[in-house]
Amino acid sequence: MRKVHLFLVLVHFIYISTSRSDSISERDILLQFKGSISDDPYNSLASWVSDGDLCNSFNGITCNPQGFVDKIVLWNTSLAGTLAPGLSNLKFIRVLNLFGNRFTGNLPLDYFKLQTLWTINVSSNALSGPIPEFISELSSLRFLDLSKNGFTGEIPVSLFKFCDKTKFVSLAHNNIFGSIPASIVNCNNLVGFDFSYNNLKGVLPPRICDIPVLEYISVRNNLLSGDVSEEIQKCQRLILVDLGSNLFHGLAPFAVLTFKNITYFNVSWNRFGGEIGEIVDCSESLEFLDASSNELTGRIPTGVMGCKSLKLLDLESNKLNGSIPGSIGKMESLSVIRLGNNSIDGVIPRDIGSLEFLQVLNLHNLNLIGEVPEDISNCRVLLELDVSGNDLEGKISKKLLNLTNIKILDLHRNRLNGSIPPELGNLSKVQFLDLSQNSLSGPIPSSLGSLNTLTHFNVSYNNLSGVIPPVPMIQAFGSSAFSNNPFLCGDPLVTPCNSRGAAAKSRNSDALSISVIIVIIAAAVILFGVCIVLALNLRARKRRKDEEILTVETTPLASSIDSSGVIIGKLVLFSKNLPSKYEDWEAGTKALLDKENIIGMGSIGSVYRASFEGGVSIAVKKLETLGRIRNQEEFEQEIGRLGGLQHPNLSSFQGYYFSSTMQLILSEFVPNGSLYDNLHLRIFPGTSSSYGNTDLNWHRRFQIALGTAKALSFLHNDCKPAILHLNVKSTNILLDERYEAKLSDYGLEKFLPVMDSFGLTKKFHNAVGYIAPELAQQSLRASEKCDVYSYGVVLLELVTGRKPVESPSENQVLILRDYVRDLLETGSASDCFDRRLREFEENELIQVMKLGLLCTSENPLKRPSMAEVVQVLESIRNGFGS
């Protein structure tokens, strides 16, 4: 018995000695890991010292009862460096959590030894390369998170080889392509997976709902397709399903809304159609319902109003009709309602005012009538109220001014009347205020000058009168924000306040006495008589010497002269370098009758080259359509605001001409033609090339891409309000003598042909390959991201030398974006390159190609801004883009 006791003591001693020995060894392993760290900005590893207590003093380290490293948790510490292979010698580690750092490279192959690992979380780092296949050998793994890195390639089929214990997998926010392996259905204990924000194609794996405990499915922002309604409805345990921003079609799986545990349901930005259908017994757990940007039809089912816990309801941009259910006011938890861009009619339910937690109410572009209910003023935490594009009438209720937290107030394009309440100036947090295209009258309250947070302001197209308040904050929005108010005057309008009786219309003006009125009338009669005499004298002189009295506001175009020979057109020049004599314009404008001087034909008219003595040339666009422009004043307002814009990559406006029979836009002549001509013209002038301009090397193409991006960034960010192009294409990118880009036709969106019921007019057809999906679908919420999409197509043109849409054969159509994406996903990126290119860095072309694909993402939210595009291009050129 004594021998047995001694034996046990000896074994215990040996075990303790071994533990201490291994513990010392693990300390060295961790110190080696520390040595591989190139930057530790928060000194997170300062406690990792050679004489420190591994289990008690090493920050982020947890040991098991035996003294071995059990967990490494160093999250959000911004550590930089590579992952040390030596960690593979930690024999008992279960958790490796390095979330929120800056590690580069890939997971070392040696990590296949970590058979005890339960958790790998390296999310939000800068790791790259393919997803390591050895992960499939880690049979104890429960939790795998590789999200928000730069992993590429396909998901290894073997990843789900030994996944009996796996509960959660996230590969979100990477550059993964290919399909979702069908083997994922073998993971019987998988609770959820997140593959969102990648480039995955194909369908959801069949029998995905055979996984008995599946609760979370997120595949947002991919290229997945197919009909999912029947399969998804079998996942009875679902808590979250996010299928947003894909290409799914058929019926949306709305039956999921009745599942007991469902809290989050997103099927937005797909191609789902049909009716929502009646929702019986909506889940009391449901908080988020987003089915926006699909092709849903029918009415909003009243069953949706039974979702008592719902916080967000977004059915925007569908084809829904009927009215807004009055019972929506009983959904007491709602904080966001978005129903805009549908065919919904009726009135705005008053009971919406009982939603005390409502923050966003967006009902734009519907067919609503009646008034904006005063009850909405009870929604005291409301941040956004957008009821634009309806048929609402009545006055702007002063009670709405109780919405002191409001940031977006958009009432434009309705039939509102009355005056602008001065109390609007109390909305100190408002950033977006649009009252345009109504029937508002009276003066603009000076109190609006106190709105210091405004980034958008517009009161155009009303019946406002009086003097625009001389407040820089208001005047900074330019004349377009005040245009088409017949009795409004003062800066920034060109209408002085001593003309047209504008100032006299102000309600703030003092009442005039009868005697003063009599004096004014008498003076006016005398002045009128003097004007008549002067006019007669001027007319007589004009007949004697017509050519001597021509000013820069008249021009003798043949089509604009009436039967008496009187010139009736108006010419305005923005440039002092252009000739202003009668003879010069008479000779120069004869080119408009000569087809040999046509240098381009676009969506809104033909472009001619007009030349003058002394070698001066300008481009003259002869408009064939005025789009949404209704009269001369509106024409001059639109062109006038563009005359002062100056940027090295913009083709500057030189002036305009307007008559009842002809409208011209004068702009800078750029000698090397358009980018389209240089890329695609079969016989390019001045070269021996049979296809395009061989002088357009990659260096020049890159500079064209960068210059165009800078021009668009200027229009979007430096112009107040922002100027949208909405017609970006290679024919509107001109090249000067040094092949620098000059963007033309900017700010002319109102002149574009109006979209018809089939999408686009025939004249606009040649731009179809450039049009963003939301614009082609006639979404009235055009944004800067529409220009980003078109610009992305131009990037792909520059890299490939191909047109946006080509027909290689009679029954075949090649869409450039899809063509490039397919080749990139199959690892054949170099097959996309324009074969005429020589002396280029392959990686640079690939980076630009990827940027083009990012810019042409289906979802506008996934596209970068033009300012970000400029930064990316500059980093690519400086060698940091790879």
From Swiss-Prot:
It is a single-pass type I membrane protein. Its main location: membrane. It is found in: Cell membrane. Coiled coil: none annotated. Residues 22-515 are extracellular. SUPFAM superfamilies: L domain-like, Protein kinase-like (PK-like). This is Probable LRR receptor-like serine/threonine-protein kinase At1g12460. PROSITE patterns: PROTEIN_KINASE_DOM. Residues 593-876 form the Protein kinase domain.
